[in-house]
Swiss-Prot record:
GO terms for cellular component: NuA4 histone acetyltransferase complex; nucleus. PANTHER family: MBT DOMAIN-CONTAINING PROTEIN 1, POLYCOMB GROUP PROTEIN. Keywords: Chromatin regulator, Chromosome, Metal-binding, Nucleus, Repeat, Transcription, Transcription regulation, Zinc, Zinc-finger. Zn(2+) binds at C77, C80, C97, C101. This is MBT domain-containing protein 1. A zinc finger (FCS-type) spans 68-103. It is found in: Nucleus; Chromosome. Residues 1-55, 581-621 are annotated as: Disordered. Residues 1-21 have a biased composition (Basic and acidic residues). It comes from the Eukaryota. MBT repeats lie at residues 164-268, 276-373, 374-479, 487-583. Gene3D superfamilies: 2.30.30.140, 3.30.60.160. PROSITE patterns: MBT, ZF_FCS.
Length: 621
């Protein structure tokens, strides 16, 4: 029996460079450069320079927003009744204030209660995904919605995935799943080895009438992430007893384990009379075949150990003000995902979910070191049992040299909107921080106090040079209220007196990630990051992936980097004990589609880009 090779002996994956197709847009100049700056402080909120007073300013429930056209108008959510700025509402129809309300409305109308399941408490205690009241993350209506919540009594149904099976889903739809090797941050991602179709393993024999637990040898017929379709040896081309299981499960063993462990190998009773000499049959079938490495179970166990522990303190983005960080404490760790509770939360309900390799978390003192805004925590509320997470636990960013040709305030670029991850928008560098970090604002929809500026590192795969969308045939979302359509960068730079950020400063590295269009996976809904959902890769642009959540409309899609720690192989939730959100029933999707079709925007309206979903990252957990 041949063992699979240790992947450590393999050569590292080849790296290839993204073609530099943006040179034609590099060096756009204007008569003058708009470079506004703002002061900074170490551990307190700093004042941010307001946007030019020439733009109309709209106040909505305590938050101040500017709109170039001054024609925003108001709208009322058909689900929760909240009133707010129309342009801040979700979807093209502007019928709902948030993703949650849109989904809830559709679900309730079809008696499916999808949102109730999405926001409820999971049945498995191991998952510990806590139930809490939803927070509408629209910056324009956040305060009013919080007031509304106090007057409402919402009963949520427990989260359930009854009836959903990855195996049945893969088989019935005849689709493939992304291999485990695509997810280097996931358990076994770096040591999956030669596990492939044809590998033989020893598994429990469920086709037996014996009173004790017995085993038999099976072969992998098909792989889907951590899951494998298995067929007992002796069934040949008969698939009647094929079954799916998680390869990393405790009952999966390499061939030979039963012999060394003293466990009985018994053929399935359906075929036990097929051969008179099963030993000779197995010798013939297994000669030259591969099996799992003998230490496979040990490696799985080691890969399920995580360095972050409860009570560790970190700095994490403030989900109510994206421009600053706050101190949070690790409450629980599930599969490398952290449930962080903001240190000032007395009842531990003000939380935030992210992976331990997320660029949104940092060691204590990070904000001060780079000049990032920080919300100081009341020292009296600190618990003695909490301690600062060691700095070596955090993901390291790429070293950059901030020379004379570095990014400058006022430069234009294209960026994934952190409040609407389905859109890549026209953006501006609002502030240059230390160590390569930048504060980015989305043109046309920034809060006047800069509270929705977002911190990206210069090497981030979520920012792009001017012209990236045009060259790669991606719809670029123009500034809200911009009427000169179709949008042309050359004209916009001239009109705003701005220059494009130099192309050479952007990250052009493209790893050989292995993803293909149509592959299935489990993905975090970053608009409500406690949820991990059934998803599909629908488009690939270099290292950028378009992730679609099965059962939901395309407007819920999200742009994600191929190395994002928020993507996982099929079977990850089962392996770690996390709750998987199944696809929405087709009836609900159809209902939403019909509503959207009936209320399409009039062609006379000038703005045709994606509407920003004013949802703060992290408000689902």
């Amino acid at each position: 029996m041949e063992k699979t090779k240790d992947p450590a002996d393999r050569s590292s994956r080849s790296e290839r460079k993204r073609r530099d197709s943006f040179g034609m847009f590099d060096g756009y100049d204007s008569c003058s450069e708009d470079t506004s700056s703002s002061s900074s402080s170490d551990e307190s909120e700093e004042e941010v320079a307001p946007l030019p007073s020439s733009l109309p300013i709209i106040k909505n429930n305590g938050q101040v927003y500017t709109y170039p056209d001054g024609k925003s108008g108001m709208a009322t959510c058909e689900m929760c009744g909240m009133v707010g700025v129309r342009d801040a509402f979700y979807s093209k129809t502007k019928r709902f204030c948030s993703v949650s309300c849109s989904r809830s409305y559709s679900s309730n109308s079809k008696k499916a209660s999808i949102l109730a399941r999405l926001q409820g408490k999971p049945p498995t205690k191991k998952a510990k995904v806590l139930q809490k009241k939803p927070l509408v993350a629209k910056l324009a209506a956040y305060a009013q919605y919080k007031a509304t919540l106090k007057n409402q009594s919402v009963n949520k149904a427990p989260v359930t995935v009854e009836g959903f099976s990855w195996g049945n889903y893969i088989t019935s739809n005849n689709v493939i799943a992304a291999p485990v090797t695509c997810f280097r941050h996931a358990p076994m991602g770096n040591c999956w080895g030669d596990i492939a179709e044809g590998v033989r393993i020893e598994v429990p024999n469920t086709d037996s009438n014996l009173p004790t637990k017995v085993f038999w040898i099976s072969g992998i017929v098909k792989l889907a992430g951590y899951n494998a379709l298995l067929r007992y040896e002796g069934f040949e081309n008969d698939s009647s007893l094929d079954f799916w299981c998680n390869i990393c499960g405790p009952d999966i063993h390499p061939v030979g384990w039963c012999a060394t462990s003293g466990k009985p190998l018994v053929p399935p009773q359906s075929i036990q009379h097929k051969y008179t000499n099963w030993k000779a049959f197995l010798v013939k079938r297994l000669t030259g075949a591969k099996t799992l490495p003998p230490d496979f179970s040990q490696k799985v166990s080691e890969n399920m150990q995580y360095p972050f522990k409860p009570s560790m303190r970190v700095e994490v983005v403030d989900k109510t003000h994206l421009c600053r960080t706050r101190v949070a404490v690790v409450e629980s760790v599930i599969g490398g995902r952290l449930r962080l509770v903001y240190e000032e939360s007395e009842d531990k309900t003000d939380d935030f979910w992210c992976h331990m390799y997320s660029p949104l978390i940092h060691p204590i003192g990070w904000s001060r070191s780079i000049g990032h805004r920080f919300k100081r925590t009341d020292i009296l509320k600190k618990q003695e049992s909490n301690y600062d997470a060691p700095s070596h636990l955090f993901i390291k960013v790429k070293d950059v040299e901030q020379g004379s040709e570095w990014f400058k305030e006022g430069m234009k670029l294209e960026a994934i909107d952190p409040l609407n991850l389905s859109a890549i928008c026209v953006a501006t560098i609002r502030k240059v921080l230390a160590e390569g970090y930048l504060m980015i604002g989305i043109d046309g929809s920034e809060a006047a106090d800069g509270s929705d500026w977002f911190c990206y590192h210069a090497s981030s795969p979520s920012i792009f040079p001017v012209g990236f969308c045009e060259i790669n045939k991606i719809e670029l979302t123009p500034p809200r209220g911009y009427t000169k359509l179709p949008f042309k960068w050359f004209d916009y730079l001239r009109e705003t007196g701005s220059i494009a950020a130099p192309v050479k400063l952007f990250n052009k590295d493209v790893p050989n990630h292995g993803f293909r269009v149509g592959m299935k996976l489990e993905a975090v809904d970053l608009m409500e990051p406690r949820l991990v959902c059934v998803a599909t890769v629908t488009r690939i642009i270099h290292r950028l992936l378009r992730i679609h959540f099965d059962g939901w409309e395309d407007e819920y899609d999200q742009w994600v980097d191929c190395e994002s720690p928020d993507l996982y192989p099929v079977g990850w939730c089962q392996l770690t004990g996390y709750q998987l959100q199944p696809p929405a029933p087709q009836s609900n999707k159809d209902g939403q589609s019909n509503v959207s079709k009936q209320k399409k925007k009039s062609k006379s309206q000038p703005y045709k880009g994606h509407k920003k979903n004013f949802r703060k990252p992290g408000n689902r957990p």
